Curated annotation (Swiss-Prot):
Part of the 50S ribosomal subunit; part of the 5S rRNA/L5/L18/L25 subcomplex. Contacts the 5S and 23S rRNAs. This is one of the proteins that bind and probably mediate the attachment of the 5S RNA into the large ribosomal subunit, where it forms part of the central protuberance. Keywords: Ribonucleoprotein, Ribosomal protein, RNA-binding, rRNA-binding. GO terms for biological process: translation. This is Large ribosomal subunit protein uL18. InterPro entries: Ribosomal_uL18_bac-type (IPR004389), Ribosomal_uL18_bac/euk (IPR005484). One of its GO terms (cellular component) is cytosolic large ribosomal subunit. PANTHER family: 39S RIBOSOMAL PROTEIN L18, MITOCHONDRIAL, LARGE RIBOSOMAL SUBUNIT PROTEIN UL18M. It comes from Prochlorococcus marinus (strain AS9601). GO terms for molecular function: 5S rRNA binding; structural constituent of ribosome.
Length: 122
């Protein structure tokens, strides 16, 4: 039996998670995508199929403060705080966390912890 690549394992976990992670207007889904260099997070209303708010390490607001954010846990926590601030501004306090098939560790965990500290509940 051949071993699955890390990317295929992540995709398989994500498909399995998405079966039961469905966000709506009252409790939207906080989706996280992690690449090698950046991290992206967005709050999605699946019933209306719209993105309510988003934040990433390539965001204009973050680029103005610093030239380039490294791909580490500190950058992820900055993105988590920014996303929580934007979500609360739009009236969202509770979300469903979708880690996107990634393990809840490192940059994904840092983003989640920062969003919780900034006021989001999940």
């Amino acid at each position: 039996m051949t071993k699955l690549s890390r990317k295929l394992q992540t995709q398989k976990r994500h498909r399995r998670l998405r079966r039961y992670l469905i966000g709506d207007a009252t409790r939207p889904r906080l989706s996280v995508y992690r690449s090698n260099n950046h991290i992206y997070a967005q709050v999605i209303d699946d019933s209306a199929q719209t993105t309510i708010c988003s934040a990433s390490t390539v965001d204009k607001e973050l680029k103005e403060k610093s030239e380039k954010l490294p791909s580490d846990c500190n950058s992820s926590s900055i993105v988590g705080k920014l996303l929580a601030k934007r979500a609360i501004k739009k009236g969202i306090k509770q979300v469903i966390f979708d880690r996107g098939g990634n393990l809840y560790h490192g940059r994904v965990k840092a983003l989640a912890d920062a969003a919780r500290e900034a006021g989001l509940e999940f």
